[in-house]
Amino acid sequence: MKKNQIDIVTMGCSKNLVDSELIMKQFEENGFHCTHDSKRPQGEIAVINTCGFIEAAKEESINTILEFINRKKNGQLNKLYVMGCLSQRYKDELEAELPEVDKFYGKFNYKQLLTDLGKADVPACNGVRHLTTPRHYAYVKIAEGCDRHCAYCAIPLITGRHHSRPVEEVLDEVRGLVAQGVKEFQIIEQELTYYGVDLDGKHHITELISRMADIEGVEWIRLHYAYPNQFPLDLLDVIAEKPNVCKYLDIAFQHISNHMLDRMRRHVSKQETLDLIAEIRRRVPGIHLRTTLLVGFPGETDEDFEELKEFVTNARFERMGAFSYSEEEGTYSAIHYKDDVPEDVKQARLDELMAIQQGISEELEAEKVGKTFKVIIDRKEGEYYVGRTEFCSPEVDPEVLVSSSEKSLRIGKFYDVCITDSDEFDLFGEVVK
């Protein structure tokens, strides 16, 4: 057990990761040494940043807490603290069930932890944080919360209403990250296209991204978690015209059947969805779309699912994730709908949908063979350098494996790479001499 060492464990999404990075920086400015997601935690203090989005995430968070409780019982840990979405939503229940945890913090009061550790004079962060990602890319969280209230989603119950950071504050953070050597920026929030509306009633995402793209040193900007309803079409012009805004958009459609979209409270129709996809592809040729779909929602019929399969087949998304519905207490669907799709049917539909997408993804990736792309190198792994094109977000998308026998490549540097082969998961390439 190492004195003055704090082991941080982050569960869930990249938005949680940003919170962990912020508090790690504050810990370090107050004399602590921090590790993140260490396979061999040795600190005298542990902080677990939990996820409470869906049942599987809750279970993973609880199991992690229990692991550290055992370490504490075995004398391998002095203090255990829990923060994040799970403790934001279930603080009272967790305190009653897990008294071994020294204190639970919510999603927004975690900075109180420093005061509780005797560090009352907490320096202001101003977006400066301890990056846990490779030093050439970072996540930038531009807002918290969500005003949409989709029927299945617990996020508004956890994080509250949409709250945008001011434009200048975000831009200052990006400038600071550029000064640290960051080249690539993953722009994240729960509903990116709503950014700024809570500030003055106007969409400001286009202004933000346009101004961000003009900052010297910003090589790539990638946009995550857009919403199809009231999508600001002028954002597409920025994606098309700014060379450092990646031709990539993460936009969750969830379903295509009008019956399902209505029950999900998505406030968008099938035709509006199809029209938006066509407009995106028209305005930004070559754009890669990542989407998320939900199967097994209450009331989903065989006909609804057939529509969804047809949608995936015709839309030919470059990237797609899909999930089966799980009831989340307090949500509209949990209160008003019966979870009436059997679990085996949910799983069968999920498997069938992913099989369709797998074939599409393999075809689209194979079309890249023989073409040259700008690739950033993330790491060396065995006999390959592993990198990504502008069409690939870290952690979730295919990677480019470049043979290390060619020459020594530098992590965080861009190279022109000719794609020589593809498989189910990745691309293979050679640096253009």
Give the positions of each predicted feature.
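Extended hydrophobic-aromatic, low-complexity segments
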Residues: 247-248, 261-262, 285-288, 303-305, ...
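Proteins enriched for Cys/Gly/acidic motifs involved in redox and nucleic-acid/cofactor modification
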Residues: 1-195, 234, 249, 271-279, ...
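Glycine-centered loop/turn positions within well-structured domains
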Residues: 111, 148, 193, 258-259, ...
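Conserved, mostly hydrophobic/aromatic
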Residues: 170, 187, 223, 251, ...
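Active-site proximal loops enriched in glycine and acidic residues that flank catalytic Cys/His/Asp
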Residues: 189, 225, 253-255, 291-295, ...
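Terminal RNA-binding accessory module
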Residues: 335-433
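Conserved SAM/AdoMet-binding glycine-rich loop
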Residues: 78-84, 89, 94, 179-305, ...
